[in-house]
Amino acid sequence: MKHSFSRFFGLGEKEQEPEIAEHDTNKEEILEIPVNAIVPNRFQPRTIFSDEKIKELAMTIHTHGIIQPIVVRHTEEEGQYELIAGERRWRAVQSLEWEKIPAIIKDFSDTETASVALIENLQREELSSIEEAHAYARLLELHDLTQEALAQRLGKGQSTIANKLRLLKLPQPVQEAIMEKKITERHARALIPLKQPELQVTLLTEIIEKSLNVKQTEDRVVKMLEQGQRKPKPRRKAFSRDTRIAMNTIRQSLSMVEDSGVKLNTEEEEFEEYIQLTIRIPK
């Protein structure tokens, strides 16, 4: 039975579609290979492995054994294998200090190996939002796909792919905060409209320190955007000492004229380069 992974290989050319042995092991030879002869998959999208979950898996394997063999390929170094699928099982077996592990050896290219690792993890739905976004980006690059085509192959909405990829445009501190579960993906998406990395990191600090929820974060973003749109008032030039003396002299003279019984209508306007004084004397 063909696994959905195969839809990525050969861009639909059936004769080039390899089968993923993990899901159809009846026709594959299962070998016992040394645990210490295996190296991790360099295309592994997962960067964080939960020690607690590895420990739980190790207990299950200790009780029931390995139901599904891992999948590996030969490396250039003789007697060494690179993981294609099953890193959690391999780590669990390492913790049990087993010497050998059941495995199926495949002859996969780098592209096929990377695709299997990426898609296997995506389908397990255990990746962080950032790891998932990097996986999507890598698949788009490996197979020269559009977001829409990738969404169809994974059975996801195009908007889901797009929303995840937008997270990769956020500054590194924000991405790390998602990975470390200091903020949620929704918090991170709320920061995107700010655009300026400095503002995004500033608000990130506030979210963490004040434990802001998503709605509060969105409100803060709106306020920060409004503040950025306000144009600062142009600075007026300071009056020189001579200008102040001249204006005071004129005002005193006008005051003396009004004291004599003549009603004046005066207006003062201040411009960038000068002060305009308008005097109206009724006939």
Swiss-Prot record:
SUPFAM superfamilies: KorB DNA-binding domain-like, ParB/Sulfiredoxin
Compartments where found: Cytoplasm, Nucleoid
GO annotation (BP), single: chromosome segregation
Ranges in coiled-coil conformation: none
Keyword tags: Cell cycle, Cell division, Cytoplasm, DNA-binding, Septation
Superkingdom, taxonomy of origin: Bacteria
MF (Gene Ontology): DNA binding
DNA-binding region: 148-167
PANTHER family on file: CHROMOSOME-PARTITIONING PROTEIN PARB-RELATED (PTHR33375), NUCLEOID OCCLUSION PROTEIN (PTHR33375:SF8)
Pfam families xref list: HTH_ParB, ParBc
Function: Effects nucleoid occlusion by binding relatively nonspecifically to DNA and preventing the assembly of the division machinery in the vicinity of the nucleoid, especially under conditions that disturb the cell cycle. It helps to coordinate cell division and chromosome segregation by preventing the formation of the Z ring through the nucleoid, which would cause chromosome breakage.
InterPro entries recorded: Chromosome_partition/occlusion, HTH_ParB/Spo0J, Nucleoid_occlusion_protein, ParB/RepB/Spo0J, ParB/Sulfiredoxin_dom, ParB/Sulfiredoxin_sf
Induction, per UniProt: Expressed constitutively.
Entry annotated with the keyword Secreted: no
One cellular component (GO) term of this entry: chromosome
Family as reported in the entry's similarity comment: Belongs to the ParB family.
Name of protein: Nucleoid occlusion protein
